[in-house]
């Protein structure tokens, strides 16, 4: 267990002589907005280290290691770990490769868990009984430490095997690009002024109600970040929507809508002030009504046609259809095509490696809609 600044510096100096590392994190995120880092696991091919973030104060050597361009950092299903690194250190591992992504290019399902991968490659069944442990509690038990260490001990040799398999299959460039896309997604920070678009059933609201929802959702997200509270512990999403829908004028009306006592006690006056602000807006300051994607004419038909095209293409190229196009990515494409959401960048299905395989066929298909 690495618990001092000097020990961490020595570990990082040794690790920087290697070309690849396996990394993992353990964290807790129950009531907080940001993940609370409890442990970092590192394996450089020679030494497994468990790094205790609760006792270390000087992170510069580790940050330099994270950013060392000569060392590939392997993680498995690392999307949340990327967020943990970004929040704790202001950066993500780079270059970074996700073994779950690698595995999906050589026949494994996209959702392939680490224990499944370990059993497939080594025949070892990992003990997952500590997965729900409190990683902020100290001291950690020997069993907890063994569980945490196993995640990186097995990861690095499996990563090397998968890299070779993906290279032989001709997908290495695509896999690396997919990992870059993961990093890019995790680096995108939601603008509080756009948070209203993420609220379930926002499309059911009229323009003035939407203006109210925009104010409410922006306030809630800022408050959650400021207080480090999960957004639903500020005000539950369904209650936020009800406030926008009914635009109450008193604490009694908030109570009648079903808001909790703590929501009214801590935030009731603020909610009412935001409702009043929305009521005072001029008509030309109100947002346009939101279209509901699934109610668009032809949605079900075009979705089915895209799924069929993806299935056909994935079979031809021997990679999983799940990897090639998720429901989220198909909906992103259709939102872009019908201009239902802000047009910030090209959809994932017609850019990068997916665009090379699907782009022209999708553009032709969408001409009918």
From Swiss-Prot:
GO terms for biological process: tRNA 3'-end processing. Exonuclease involved in the 3' processing of various precursor tRNAs. Initiates hydrolysis at the 3'-terminus of an RNA molecule and releases 5'-mononucleotides. One of its GO terms (molecular function) is nucleotide binding. HAMAP family: RNase_D (MF_01899). Its main location: cytoplasm. One of its GO terms (cellular component) is cytoplasm. The keyword Cytoplasm applies. Its EC number is 3.1.13.5. It comes from Cronobacter turicensis (strain DSM 18703 / CCUG 55852 / LMG 23827 / z3032). The gene is rnd. PROSITE patterns: HRDC. CDD domains: RNaseD_exo. Residues 1-166 form the 3'-5' exonuclease domain. Its cofactor is a divalent metal cation. InterPro entries: 3'-5'_exonuclease_dom, HRDC-like_sf, HRDC_dom, HRDC_dom_sf, RNase_D, RNase_D-like, RNAseD_HRDC_C, RNaseH-like_sf. This is Ribonuclease D. The lineage of its organism: Bacteria, Pseudomonadati, Pseudomonadota, Gammaproteobacteria, Enterobacterales. Residues 206-285 form the HRDC domain. Belongs to the RNase D family. The keyword Translocase does not apply. Keywords: Cytoplasm, Exonuclease, Hydrolase, Nuclease, tRNA processing. It catalyses: Exonucleolytic cleavage that removes extra residues from the 3'-terminus of tRNA to produce 5'-mononucleotides. Pfam families: DNA_pol_A_exo1, HRDC, RNAseD_HRDC_C.
């Amino acid at each position: 267990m690495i618990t001092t600044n000097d020990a961490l510096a020595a570990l990082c100096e040794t690790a920087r002589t290697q070309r690849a590392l396996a990394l993992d994190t353990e964290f807790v995120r129950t009531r907080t907005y940001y993940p609370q880092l409890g442990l970092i696991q590192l394996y450089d091919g020679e030494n497994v280290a468990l790094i205790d973030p609760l006792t270390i104060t000087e992170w510069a050597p580790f940050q330099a290691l994270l950013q060392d361009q000569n060392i590939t950092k392997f993680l498995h299903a690392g999307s949340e770990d990327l967020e943990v690194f970004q929040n704790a250190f202001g950066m993500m591992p780079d270059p970074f490769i996700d073994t779950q992504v690698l595995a999906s290019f050589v026949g494994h399902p996209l959702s392939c868990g680490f224990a499944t991968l370990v059993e497939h490659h080594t025949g070892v069944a990992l003990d997952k009984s500590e997965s729900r442990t409190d990683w902020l509690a100290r001291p950690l038990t020997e069993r907890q430490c063994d569980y945490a260490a196993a995640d990186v001990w097995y990861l690095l040799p499996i990563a090397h095997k998968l890299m070779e398999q993906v290279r032989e299959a001709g997908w290495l460039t695509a896999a690396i690009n997919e990992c870059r896309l993961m990093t890019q997604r995790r680096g995108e920070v939601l603008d509080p002024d756009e948070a209203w678009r993420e609220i379930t059933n926002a499309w059911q609201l009229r323009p003035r109600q939407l203006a109210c929802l925009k104010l409410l959702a922006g306030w809630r997200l800022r408050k959650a970040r400021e207080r480090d509270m999960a957004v639903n512990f500020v005000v539950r999403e369904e209650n936020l929507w009800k406030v926008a829908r009914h635009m109450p004028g008193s604490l009694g009306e908030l109570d009648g809508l079903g808001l909790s006592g703590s929501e009214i006690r801590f935030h009731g006056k603020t909610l009412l002030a935001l409702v009043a602000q929305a009521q005072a807006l001029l008509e030309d300051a109100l947002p346009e009504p939101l279209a509901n994607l699934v109610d668009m004419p032809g949605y079900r038909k075009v979705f089915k046609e895209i799924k069929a095209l993806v299935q056909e293409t994935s079979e031809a190229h021997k990679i999983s259809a799940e990897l090639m196009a998720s429901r989220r990515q198909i909906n992103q494409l259709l939102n872009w095509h019908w201009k239902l959401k802000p047009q910030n960048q090209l959809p994932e299905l017609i850019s990068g490696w997916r665009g090379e395989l699907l782009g022209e066929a999708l553009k032709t298909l969408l001409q009918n809609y």
